[in-house]
Amino acid sequence: MTSLGIVTPQSMFFSTPLPLQSGAEITDYTLVYETYGTLNADHSNAVLVCHALNASHHVAGSYSEDASTRGWWDNMVGPGKPLDTDKFFVIGVNNLGSCFGSTGPMHANPATGKPYGPQFPVVTVEDWVQSQARLADALGIRQFAAVMGGSLGGMQALAWSILFPERLRHCVVIASTPKLTAQNIAFDDVARQAILTDPDYHGGDYYAHGVVPKNGLRVARMLGHITYLSDDDMAVKFGRDLRSGSYQFGFGIDFEIESYLRYQGDKFSEYFDANTYLLITKALDYFDPAKDFGGDLTKTLSHTRAQFLLVSFSTDWRFAPERSHEMVQALVNNKRMVTYAEIDASHGHDAFLLDDARYMSVVRAYYERVYKEIDGGSLKAGAQV
């Protein structure tokens, strides 16, 4: 397996207003994206990869020789990798409201010429999917071979199967959920409160004050990071190890886990936008496609037409395997073709980003099947399942 090498982001401007679930709309917006591989003649080999909370369009490859610039899913996407760019044309899109290039709170509001800040409209998973569909239209892709994502990205993939059932043949949902539990919403709210109560937040207009609510971002990230790890993984990595070998009898850093979380918080506060964090966690909280169907997930998924791959991880307590079981059962109730794997992995929610041989083998085998449909000539442009 080799790397994609140096990749370059692209952008596309849209002047047609995008209506949002809230009733608001976004006008004059830009989506930043990257593509890997080659689109075949009938456009049947395109795969959309949707990103999670703090990720972006930069799925794979690098921006320089510096390894730190590698994409967030470089182990998954590339030549000879599970999602093989020698076979598929892969697209990564940065979602609206993000801080990595697509229009978001940091960008100028056309109506005022000043940063949107807290005036940027609340967006939902469904809004992101609508914007991604517009990008697909502009790229000449009527139907994806697959739409794929992990965590929040998996929610977007699921939403694609509901909103545009005819526009994807396969839906790959990894370490995800059909809705957040009360516990998950509680974690998100505490994280938001850390930001909202930071004196440097200034009601979201901190750009004008030349400051960043770093303390709030630090705490939000520290809290979030705890939910991405498993108790088993934390015990192995950190246990009760002391940073200096003995108690300091103060309120500084005693334990290695404290040092690790503060490092993660400090790093996050240097590159992520606070208003974006608020927006994305709200999108997480609001995602509940079964809400309009009386909470019945089977009814919600009754109009889907894709085939599905779902993967969960045994120690993921952020989006536990039970959440994937719910989706699998609803799909089976609808007699949909579904492949499911629960990986016994110790790394918690973050396992979906890591190199577990069993996990990678499952995804690789599934995409080999997807490719056989294309390469075997059974599909024509616009073919539907």
From Swiss-Prot:
The EC designation for this entry is: 2.3.1.46
- To which pathway does this protein belong? Amino-acid biosynthesis; L-methionine biosynthesis via de novo pathway; O-succinyl-L-homoserine from L-homoserine: step 1/1
Family annotation (InterPro entries): AB_hydrolase_1 (IPR000073), AB_hydrolase_fold (IPR029058), HAT_MetX-like (IPR008220)
Reaction catalysed by this enzyme: L-homoserine + succinyl-CoA = O-succinyl-L-homoserine + CoA
Q: Which principal EC class is assigned to this enzyme?
A: transferase
Q: Which part of the chain is the AB hydrolase-1 domain? A: 45-355
Q: Which GO terms describe its cellular component?
A: cytoplasm
Please give one Gene Ontology molecular function term for this protein.
homoserine O-succinyltransferase activity
Q: Residues that bind substrate, according to the entry?
A: 221, 350
What keyword terms does UniProt attach to this protein? Answer: Acyltransferase, Amino-acid biosynthesis, Cytoplasm, Methionine biosynthesis, Transferase
Q: Where does this protein reside within or beyond the cell?
A: Cytoplasm
- Do you know which SUPFAM superfamilies this protein is assigned to? alpha/beta-Hydrolases
* Pfam families assigned: Abhydrolase_1 (PF00561)
Chain positions of site Important for acyl-CoA specificity: 318
Which GO BP annotation is one of this protein's?
Answer: homoserine metabolic process
Task: List the active-site residues.
Answer: 151 (nucleophile), 316, 349
Q: List the coiled-coil residues.
A: none
Q: Which PANTHER family match?
A: HOMOSERINE O-ACETYLTRANSFERASE
Subunit structure and binding partners: Homodimer.
What is known about what this protein does? Transfers a succinyl group from succinyl-CoA to L-homoserine, forming succinyl-L-homoserine.
> What family is it from?
Belongs to the AB hydrolase superfamily. MetX family.
Q: What is this protein called?
A: Homoserine O-succinyltransferase
Which species is this UniProt entry from?
Answer: Herminiimonas arsenicoxydans
